[in-house]
Amino acid sequence: MNDVHPPDPDLALDIDGCCRLTGEFTLRSGQVASEYFDKYLFEADPTLLARVARVMVQLLPEDTDLVGGLELGGIPIATMVSSLTGRPAVFVRKKAKEYGTCKLAEGPDVSGRRVTLIEDVVTTGGAVRDATKALREAGAVVEVVVCAIDRSPEGENPLADVGLEVRPVLTKAELDGAR
């Protein structure tokens, strides 16, 4: 749970109603889940996207130089957060492109800058872990990830092993409680 509640008391209910799907879903981690939060449903809705981004702005560390949107789901959210804060965005690919600039991180140079990662859903943190490693190798200071939904087990930080603090807009428990 984060300490900015209730910035938008109906957000959990609205996100849950829009995005919760039931069935059998294989997650990036290989885990199988009976429920899935289709984050693209809220990311494609400009009103819901803006509401999520406004909460994220409150969760950003004050010393953030760049907001780093992870491909693909973190990019629309990071763009909105960038627009609301005036902080530049950097877009982090899953894999460096093999042509042109051959960059993994598109946008301003990250070297020596504090990058706060923006992600849609964190469960085990695999994509965030990969992006953190790549950005740190490029000279960025990465200490915080702000996510729309934290699906990790309550009370656990799946990214503690890489020294990242996870700051969620909503947790799975908050979404479950909204039903």
Where are these regions (language model features)?
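Alpha-helical structural signal in soluble globular domains
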Residues: L59, M80-T85, A134, P158-V162
